[in-house]
Amino acid sequence: MEVVAVDIGGTNARFAIAEVADGRVVSLGETSMQKTADHASLQTAWQAFAASLDRPMPRAAAIAVASPVGGELIKLTNNPWIIRPALIKERLEVDEYVLINDFGAVGHAAAQLPEDYFLHLCGPDTPFTKQGMLTVCGPGTGLGVAQILCTPDGYHVIETEGGHIDFAPLDAIEDNLLKRLRKTYNRVSTERIVAGPAIVAIYETLAEIEGRAVQRLDDKAIWLMALEGKDSLALAALDRFCLSLGAVAGDLALAQGAKGVIIAGGLGLRLKDHLARSGFSERFAAKGRFRTMMEAIPVKLITHPQPGLFGAAAAFAQEHAR
């Protein structure tokens, strides 16, 4: 059957028509992007997508949102839209739907995508286990964390708030970074260190350590300089970011008993060329007495361009295969 997959973030809402069968995604059509600022609600963005098609809309929806999905009213993060689940069928003119957290959708994508969509980062270059736990984590605007429990009968995605565990500094530079962040936040979570906006605090901490006066820049400007190799301090901040991502991914894998780790998130693909040559793998494995165990865990980067859309469709497929 066909389903309209929707991935709603703070800036954009992405739409695509997916075909699902037997609990899995068969295909995902071309992506259409609607800016959330151009629409008062999901309903009007949905109608704009429908108007762009030369065919009727499927009467099923798979919707991923940047917010917890429980309750009668869903307020999206960094987005003024409000979604009332009880009104979705009426407002969108669908017969059935699935509503899922956006990183839960990434978990479903990771569970269903072929191995071709994963880039090996460290650990053994082997396929993921078909039985046991996989950890999924991904830096974007925040730090998303999910688990995938693989069984002989399929899989189950467990949504978590693992991005909000406490940050643990591992060297003097990170001690300084933590001290800086504590001036603003009483409690410093890993999301303050391993998410897109965190690059600002890392950059400014390094500048302070080196005694350099730097212009106040936003995270987008620093990321651009770092990824284009235009500024040595921005590059150093990027290296530091990768170190922290490796440490956090390793902590999560250790805590969750993971047999594999998947890196995703809005920054994942942008870091593709940098992670492998940074200190990510060393920090991931550096867990004291458990180093040997950590070195045996395959760590891969998800490379699908639209894991949120694919995962929303996958969640619908799994739900309606029962």
Regions of interest found by a model, annotated:
Residues 3-7, 58-64, 98, 134-138, ...:
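Short glycine-aspartate micro-motif
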Residues 20-24, 78-82, 113-121, 150-158, ...:
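A glycine- and small-aliphatic-rich helix-loop capping segment at beta-alpha/alpha-beta transitions
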Residues 53-99, 104-117, 268-273:
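Short beta-strand-loop/turn "lid" adjacent to the catalytic site in phosphate-handling enzymes
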Residues 96-128, 220-232, 236-239:
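ATP-dependent carbohydrate kinase catalytic cores
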Residues 1-47, 51-54, 176-322:
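ATP-binding/phosphotransfer module of carbohydrate and carboxylate kinases, centering on a glycine-rich
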Residues 121-124, 129-190, 272-273, 280-285, ...:
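Glycine-rich phosphate-binding loop of actin/hexokinase-like ATP-binding domains
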Residues 13, 68-70, 142-146, 201, ...:
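Short, acidic Gly/Pro/Ser/Thr-rich loop/turn segments
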Residues 34-36, 76-79, 98-105, 125-127, ...:
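Active-site nucleophile and cofactor-binding loops and adjacent substrate-binding regions
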